[in-house]
Swiss-Prot record:
Residues with glycosylation annotation: 410, 417
Protein name per UniProt: Cyclic AMP-responsive element-binding protein 3-like protein 3
Transmembrane spans: 320-340
Membrane topology per record: Single-pass type II membrane protein
Keywords for the protein's UniProt record, in alphabetical order: Activator, DNA-binding, Endoplasmic reticulum, Glycoprotein, Isopeptide bond, Membrane, Nucleus, Signal-anchor, Transcription, Transcription regulation, Transmembrane, Transmembrane helix, Ubl conjugation, Unfolded protein response
CDD domains (alphabetical): bZIP_CREB3
PTM characteristics: Controlled by regulated intramembrane proteolysis (RIP). Following ER stress a fragment containing the cytoplasmic transcription factor domain is released by proteolysis. The cleavage seems to be performed sequentially by site-1 and site-2 proteases (PS1 and PS2). N-glycosylation is required for optimal proteolytic activation.
Localization: Endoplasmic reticulum membrane
Cellular component aspect of the GO annotation: endoplasmic reticulum; endoplasmic reticulum membrane; membrane; nucleus
Gene: Creb3l3
All residue ranges annotated as the bZIP domain in the record: 239-302
């Protein structure tokens, strides 16, 4: 009975924890003069279960606080509702409406309903030491093990230095949304201060709404005024989302315009470079065209000069003279009158006559007619060959005499004797050589060619015929 009463007394302060901070809760519970638990024997009224001993086996203060805060926790099977006064700022969850709001009169009633549990069945409103609303009796369910474990090792400094810790801000800036989405007791155990804020959000839990200059300008343009403290209403959240969406669109448009401007600037630079290059190429083309025109003019001038030099007609007389000269140069080596003059030159060669033995024998038996000496010295006649003079020199032996008169007589005598010795056949052979050649129409360079060309038997026959004619 005493345990139930003490449990009821300790459960009632949980209803008043909503507007209080953690340090105020400790002062309210353990104050020696005005504390709620100043007359309660804690060592006899709390009996720890085996499960609680497994969770916190080595800390008496942990067992005490777990036993205090355990009945005040909400049932795990009950749905978790996000409080309306949450500090989540701009909500990015699914769109919420009036159906998402838990049944209740307001934020205060939701917190009280979640944290107030009567100690006995059938009791009325929860007793509280601060003004608060009445808590409706929830359906009785089986109380499970607390899903919130508070580590008091971090609170030991609070009890030792309450003034320093009261002024210091919370080291965990987790929102209610993040704690609810975590969905596990381990996260709450890792962040005990955040769990205490979730259980009882106080005045220090509120955050300021920080707006940029662009947001303020757009809000002023829209004619909407937002509060400086979170949380915001759904309408205010929608307005703030709309403003921030406009700012993002504006920034993206500015970025796109900036990129477009940079791209256009690059194109303009390239265009200017291409224009300068095009102008340079045009100047080169004009220069080349001028050079081409000058070359064409020079070519036309040269063509005119060539045409003037080749336009004169060739005379017919010149062509005929060239043809005759060519013909003469071709035919000249085979023309005989030119070769006769060459043969008549005395220094070319000396012909040698060979007399046949047969003619010598016949000549010795013949008697040559008397030759009448004349005033002229006998010798070769005109038109005779040089070989005749040579033969005459062989047969004439004129001795050298002292007296010129005797020389003339002796010369005549020697000539007569030589004529007799030579014979008629030899003389006829000499005389008949030139007429025979003239009759045959053969004009050869010398007699040696005639002697070498005519066979011996034919030569004898010709000589005999010549003698018969004479």
């Amino acid at each position: 009975m005493d345990g139930d009463i003490s449990t009821g007394k300790m459960a009632s302060p949980a209803c008043a924890m909503a507007p209080l901070d953690s340090m105020e809760v400790l002062d309210l519970l353990f104050d020696g003069q005005d504390g709620i638990l100043r007359n309660v024997d804690l060592a006899e009224s709390w009996i720890l279960t085996r499960e609680e001993q497994k969770v916190l086996p080595n800390s008496d203060s942990d067992e005490f606080l777990n036993s205090i805060l355990g009945p005040g926790d909400s049932d795990p099977s009950s749905p978790i509702w996000s409080p309306a006064d949450s500090d989540s700022g701009i909500s990015e969850d699914l769109p919420s409406d009036s159906q998402d709001t838990p049944p209740g009169s307001g934020p205060g009633s939701a917190n009280v309903a979640a944290r107030c549990h009567p100690s006995k069945q059938g009791e009325g409103p929860c007793p509280s030491y601060l003004p608060s609303t009445a808590c409706p009796e929830p359906p009785r369910t089986q109380v499970h093990e607390s899903s919130v474990a508070i580590d008091l090792d971090m609170w030991s400094t609070d009890t030792l230095y309450p003034e320093e810790q009261a002024g210091s801000p919370s080291r965990f800036n987790l929102t209610v949304k993040e704690l609810l989405l975590s969905g596990g007791g381990g996260d709450l155990q890792q962040h005990p201060l955040a769990a205490s804020q979730l259980l009882g959000p106080g005045s220090g839990h509120c955050q300021e709404l920080v707006l940029t200059e662009d947001e303020k300008k757009l809000l002023a343009k829209e004619g909407v005024t937002l509060p400086t403290q979170l949380p915001l209403t759904k309408y205010e959240e929608r307005v703030l989302k709309k403003i921030r969406r406009k700012i993002r669109n504006k920034q993206s448009a500015q970025e796109s315009r900036k990129k477009k401007k940079e791209y256009i600037d690059g194109l303009e630079n390239r265009m200017s470079a291409c224009t300068a290059q095009n102008q340079e190429l045009q100047r080169k083309v004009l220069h080349l065209e001028k050079q081409n025109l000058s070359l064409l003019e020079q070519l036309k001038h040269l063509q005119a000069l060539v045409v003037q030099s080749t336009s004169k007609p060739a005379h017919a007389g010149t062509c005929i003279a060239v043809l005759l000269l060519s013909f003469v140069l071709i035919i000249l080596p085979s023309i005989s009158p030119f070769t006769a003059n060459k043969v008549d030159s005395p220094g070319d060669f000396i012909p040698v006559r060979v007399f046949s033995r047969t003619l010598h024998n016949h000549a010795a038996s013949r008697v040559a007619p008397d030759v009448t000496p004349g005033p002229e010295v006998p010798g070769p006649h005109k038109g005779s060959s040089g070989g005749l003079s040579a033969d005459w020199g062989n047969f004439l032996e004129i001795p050298m005499l002292d007296d010129p008169t005797e020389e003339l007589d002796n010369t005549t005598l020697v000539l007569a004797n030589s004529t007799e010795d030579l014979g008629r056949a030899t003389l006829l052979d000499w005389v008949a050589s030139e007429p025979l050649l003239g009759q045959m129409g053969l004009e050869i360079p010398g007699e040696e060619i005639w002697l070498s060309w005519v066979p011996r038997w034919l030569r004898v026959r010709v000589v005999q015929d010549a003698l018969g004619v004479l």
